[in-house]
């Protein structure tokens, strides 16, 4: 039933209630039938479930498969399970890191679950009683006054200047006047226009009234939003999609290489026996170990965690680890207006009148908002609070004014006459101040205050006032007028009709919820980074458009549409107009989700920011949802991927930069690790084809997990490139091998493999003095040292994709430290007896050590030369 279309009496009858409320027996019966007035929360997964969820990552599944195969072969061959244990340790550490980071984010948010008032005042059997809000039932009559939180959806049945602030639900920052009158408008009436309804999540900021509860718990508007969140599927991030693609490629690559090696090995043996098959299979497994970058999953997780830490320092709290880099490829940011682009605080920005101080005095005294001079804070209805703050900025003291001119009578504001009047004692006389809508107040004025005195109002004065009013409303300001009247003594008749006539006009004050000062620069930075901001708000279209123009969001050719207009569009029409619409006003929650989904369907990576409950479904539907930590509701914070701890839209720009840096660094690490594994695969493949063993599986695990992981992690700390915020966002469909990364992995893998094979043969020659193809202890040790150190030196090449290493101005000290640590560990592994025995190494001479290091160092000049050729080729293509 649309209660707002029916009278108060009809609503009470439909709900089987009375103006005196329910009896206690009726309330108990309905509570037992309908349940408590609480929002259902989806059960949170246990730590165990979250741990196993980490194991569902495709890269982890590949590692687990490798561990299983390795375990079977080790058991069959009665060999050590060291490989299996090491791989499983990597998997466990990676999963623990993921769970820890997500848990840490949850603690950082520390969301409050109190979404409604703890207690509410209701009428039970005609008496006002206080009850826990969770025990409210349909039909209860609420007793409300300024400062109360609305504990359930309700239909107003009595109103005395009642106003409610509904920004969290509708997005509109200006409080809405509430009355008991039924609405008669045709067509759909949006939440923000239902002037006789109150909703859970809103609050009373002025006046008092009574309302009958129409819905509780999950049946409220907030409950519908919470329910919609549980129906919305989480989207995979671009990084998750790319890593899944990489896992599939690696899986097929491993299977293909193993099949080839197994087939060639059996054919070379010339006979098929259990021993031949087992030996060949073990070689194939060693290749699988070489091909799989065991440390990649852990490196990605740790690099993301580093990014999370960096973002938290910039006031951005990440709740979902893989969402860290998603902002780096965001193309659309759909942002709420109130509290996100604006300050969510009405502020006087313009005035018109002969005496600004007198105008501010009138506005401040004809208001119920209170200024605390000790804390310099103002409490009260937002519009009146803005007027009081304005008086303070002009050097006036509202508390001193009230002491000097105490209020002795008043005609409170009501929505019918759109005015409020107060009478004050002034040294034996009475002065009246009246404020209200200009179109209502101006006709009641027959004088105007000019140059310190009241003069008769003329048509020219009225025209000038009307022009000022048009100018302010044209800038989407909310305009109030003020007037005064003096008496020798307090009049006997203080009714509004008697007081509000023969007034002296003082002036106009225009106010608006102003933009955050830093947002203008933030939006400009977004545009330079190729990101398009879209405003989505529940506020009026004129106000939204004015703010959008001020911010540069609404330019020539851009459109602003209302939720009603959007609702009237079919999907085809909306798709055609989507690219031209920059502002959406008076929208409902389902409209926001539709907008986000339309951009996603068009192939754009979309972010959604917001603080109100009305933003939560669209935040959940977006590729990355951004909530506000201070003004944001708990529902919104709980579904967001990222929470801005300072509620600052400008923080998003820093998060975008960090996201891009993280992706660049992950790609550096992936390129480094895959190139390294490519060199290992090619080395073992070539050695197998030639009939000798160059490295054992345990050697490869050492390289993959110790030698390679430290530099890969250090690459994850690389600083952002200078052009990172001037290049367009990358495509969500862009392969991780794009921009020549795949080619680099192949040629650099071949390069390191050739150097490794060369080290083996040189080592064999230095040991035996002959060039032959056979197993060699010194050759294996030199090959291990060369491969390890070649990858260490090669990690420095990864700092720049195409630029020369020697053009980088800032050193990566983490990488220098990682290289030194890897060199030390590798050297210890060769020369410390128990380690050398464990890895079956032979200590090599100083000359052999120097030769191996020299071969490894060659990766630097070789890659620098190739980069030079690539840069020249790129310049030729650019000129063509």
Where are these regions (language model features)?
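Core segments of transmembrane alpha-helices
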Residues: 679-680, 744-756
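Long hydrophobic segments that form regular secondary structure
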Residues: 761, 766-767, 775
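Generic alpha-helical transmembrane segments
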Residues: 707, 780-795
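Conserved cytosolic headpiece of P-type ATPases
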Residues: 1-729, 734-737, 750, 765, ...
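Transmembrane alpha-helix/helix-exit interface in multi-pass inner-membrane proteins
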Residues: 261, 753-761
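A C-terminal functional module that forms or caps the active site or interfaces directly
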Residues: 798
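Membrane-interface starts of transmembrane alpha-helices
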Residues: 82, 775-782
């Amino acid at each position: 039933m649309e209660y707002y279309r029916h009278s108060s009496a009809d609503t009470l009858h439909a709900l089987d209630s009375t103006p005196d409320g329910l009896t206690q027996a009726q309330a108990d019966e309905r509570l037992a039938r309908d349940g408590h007035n609480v929002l259902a929360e989806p059960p949170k997964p246990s730590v165990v479930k979250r741990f196993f969820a980490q194991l569902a990552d495709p890269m982890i599944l590949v590692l687990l498969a490798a561990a299983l195969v390795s375990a079977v072969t080790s058991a069959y061959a009665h060999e050590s399970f060291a490989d299996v244990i090491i791989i499983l340790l990597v998997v466990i550490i990676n999963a623990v890191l993921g769970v820890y980071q997500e848990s840490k984010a949850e603690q950082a948010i520390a969301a409050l679950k109190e979404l409604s008032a703890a207690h509410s005042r209701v009428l039970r059997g005609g008496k006002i009683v206080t009850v826990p809000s969770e025990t409210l039932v349909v039909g209860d009559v609420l007793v409300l006054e300024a400062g109360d939180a609305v504990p359930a959806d309700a239909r107003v049945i009595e109103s005395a200047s009642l106003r409610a602030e509904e920004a969290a639900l509708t997005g509109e920052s200006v409080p809405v006047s509430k009355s008991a009158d039924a609405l008669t408008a045709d067509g759909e009436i949006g939440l923000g226009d239902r002037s006789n309804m109150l909703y859970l999540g809103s609050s009373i900021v002025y006046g008092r009234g009574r309302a009958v509860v129409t819905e509780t718990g999950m049946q409220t508007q907030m409950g519908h939003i919470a329910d919609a969140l549980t129906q919305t599927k989480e989207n995979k991030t671009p990084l998750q999609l790319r890593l899944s693609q990489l896992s599939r490629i690696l899986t097929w690559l491993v299977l293909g290489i193993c099949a080839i090696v197994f087939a060639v090995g059996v054919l070379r043996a010339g006979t098929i026996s259990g021993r031949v098959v087992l030996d060949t299979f073990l070689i194939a497994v060693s290749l699988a170990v070489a091909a799989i970058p065991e440390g990649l999953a852990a490196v990605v997780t740790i690099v993301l965690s580093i990014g999370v830490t960096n973002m938290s320092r910039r006031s951005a709290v990440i709740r979902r680890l893989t969402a860290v880099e998603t902002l780096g490829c965001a193309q659309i940011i759909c942002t709420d207006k109130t509290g996100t682009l604006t300050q969510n605080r009405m502020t006087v920005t313009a005035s018109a009148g002969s005496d600004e101080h007198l105008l501010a005095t009138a506005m401040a005294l004809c208001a119920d908002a209170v200024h605390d001079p000790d804390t310099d804070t103002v409490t009260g209805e937002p519009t009146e609070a803005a007027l009081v703050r304005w008086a303070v900025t002009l050097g006036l003291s509202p508390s001193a004014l009230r002491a000097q001119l105490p209020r002795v009578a008043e005609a409170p504001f009501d929505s019918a006459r759109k005015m409020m009047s107060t009478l004050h004692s002034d040294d034996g006389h009475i002065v009246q101040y009246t404020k209200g809508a200009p179109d209502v107040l101006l006709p009641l004025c027959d004088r105007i205050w000019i140059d310190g005195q009241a003069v008769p109002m003329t048509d020219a004065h009225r025209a000038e006032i009307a022009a000022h009013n048009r100018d302010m409303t044209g800038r989407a300001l909310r305009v109030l007028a003020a007037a005064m009247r003096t008496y020798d003594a307090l009049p006997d008749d203080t009714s509004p009709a008697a007081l509000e006539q023969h007034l002296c006009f003082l002036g106009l004050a225009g106010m608006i919820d102003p933009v955050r000062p830093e947002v203008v620069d933030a939006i400009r930075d977004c545009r330079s980074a190729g990101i398009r901001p879209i405003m989505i708000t529940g506020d009026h279209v004129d106000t939204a458009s004015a703010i959008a123009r001020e911010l540069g969001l609404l330019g020539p050719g851009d459109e602003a549409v209302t939720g009603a207009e959007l609702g009237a569009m079919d999907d085809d029409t909306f798709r055609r107009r989507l690219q031209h619409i920059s502002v959406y006003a008076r929208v409902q929650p389902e409209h926001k989700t539709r907008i986000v989904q339309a951009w996603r369907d068009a192939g754009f990576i979309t972010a959604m920011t917001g603080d109100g409950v009305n933003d939560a479904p669209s935040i959940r539907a977006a590729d990355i949802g951004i909530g506000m930590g201070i003004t944001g509701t708990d529902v919104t914070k709980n579904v967001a991927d990222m929470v801005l701890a300072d509620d600052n839209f400008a923080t998003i720009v820093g998060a975008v930069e960090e996201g891009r840096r993280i992706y660049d660094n992950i790609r550096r690490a992936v390129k480094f690790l895959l190139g390294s594994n490519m060199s290992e695969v090619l080395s073992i493949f070539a050695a197998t084809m030639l009939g000798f063993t160059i490295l054992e599986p345990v050697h490869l695990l050492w390289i993959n997990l110790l030698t390679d992981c430290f530099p890969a992690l250090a690459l994850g700390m690389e600083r952002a490139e200078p052009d990172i915020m001037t290049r367009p966002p990358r495509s969500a469909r862009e392969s991780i091998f794009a921009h020549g990364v795949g080619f680099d992995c192949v040629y650099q893998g071949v390069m390191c493999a050739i150097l490794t094979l060369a080290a083996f043969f040189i080592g064999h020659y230095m040991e035996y003095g002959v060039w032959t193809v056979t197993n060699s202890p010194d050759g294996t040790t030199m090959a291990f040292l060369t491969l390890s150190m070649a990858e260490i030196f090669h990690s420095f090449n990864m700092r720049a994709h195409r630029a020369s290493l020697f053009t980088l101005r800032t050193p990566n000290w983490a990488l220098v430290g990682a290289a030194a640590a890897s060199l030390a560990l590798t050297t210890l592994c060769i020369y410390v007896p128990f380690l050398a025995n464990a890895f079956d190494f032979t200590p090599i001479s100083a000359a052999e050590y120097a030769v191996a290091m020299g071969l490894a160092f060659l990766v630097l000049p070789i890659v620098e030369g190739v980069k030079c050729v690539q840069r020249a080729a790129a310049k030729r293509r650019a000129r063509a």
